[in-house]
């Protein structure tokens, strides 16, 4: 069932792209991301790169930023976090230039998730804090509370890691 839903969304997205409807292409692909088939990795990445080229050739900056974010999310699903981070950073750069705070805030959340997975907790926390600030400015209080829970969890985890590291060094446990 999941594979069928993904296939339908992915195929719909391709049809929209062939018809030149970039907005619906990207919206439909966003739905397909939730059902990505791990065996079709190259198809997804190739498709997104085609859209990215089209957006760049036609100077569609807003759409380019969305495609870059989708590339980041797709690489993340395939556990290619270095590539994912690269695309998220590039997307955020464009979103900031465009001044769309909502897109920047959402992009920061995706960036934070990948930073956490890659073990870069300091930058992860910073990205979550920046996203929280933007969501607060936008009046998205529910989202702000969700981020605060994530931040609390990360702070507790970081504190535990520091304590564990201290005990390992203090009692020479790491030498055995």
List PLM regions with ranges.
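Intrinsically disordered, low-complexity regions
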Residues: 1-176
């Amino acid at each position: 069932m999941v594979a069928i839903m993904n296939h339908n969304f992915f195929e719909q997205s391709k049809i929209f792209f062939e018809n030149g409807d970039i907005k619906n292409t990207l919206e439909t692909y966003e739905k397909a991301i939730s059902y990505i088939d791990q065996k079709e990795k190259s198809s997804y990445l190739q498709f997104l790169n085609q859209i990215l080229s089209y957006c760049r050739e036609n100077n569609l900056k807003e759409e380019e930023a969305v495609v870059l974010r989708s590339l980041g999310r797709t690489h993340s699903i395939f556990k290619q976090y270095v590539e994912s981070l690269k695309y998220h950073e590039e997307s955020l750069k464009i979103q900031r230039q465009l001044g769309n705070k909502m897109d920047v805030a959402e992009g920061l959340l995706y960036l934070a998730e990948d930073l956490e997975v890659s073990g870069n907790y300091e930058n992860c926390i910073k990205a979550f804090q920046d996203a929280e600030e933007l969501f607060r400015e936008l009046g998205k209080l529910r989202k702000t509370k969700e981020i605060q829970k994530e931040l609390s969890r990360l702070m507790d985890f970081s504190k535990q890691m520091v304590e564990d590291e201290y005990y390992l060094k203090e009692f020479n446990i790491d030498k055995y």
